[in-house]
């Protein structure tokens, strides 16, 4: 994201550990600046199990096991990963990213993705009318 003042939150719905692929972080890696991926991220790429080679020392990474209901918050430039879940147990996370309204995705060729992020329903007609004017 640019500007680079975005934070990510991860809330664990299940206990996570090294065996089921908990998140790993490299402390201090946000000080290295934006890391170039060197390729375009496509939907096909996202659907496959992939690795990104960033020429970093992975031994600097630390696991962050979480109990169900626990959360972590980290800067968007902190390098992070998770390994495959090698157990039969779930490892469900809720990822939320908080950014400036004018921030754009660096990995999307600096093109903002536009659209509703969340939309509920209401029985109040005045709310429906107002939303029609917005969207």
Describe each region flagged by the PLM.
Residues 1-18, 65-68, 73, 97-102:
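Short, conserved beta-strand element in jelly-roll/cupin
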Residues 2-4, 35-40, 51-54, 93-94, ...:
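Short, surface-exposed, polar/charged, turn-prone segments marking secondary-structure boundaries
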Residues 6-9, 13-14, 42-52, 61-62, ...:
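Low-complexity, flexible helical/coil segments
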Residues 16-79:
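Double-stranded beta-helix
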Residues 71-73, 77-135:
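Non-heme Fe(II)/2-oxoglutarate
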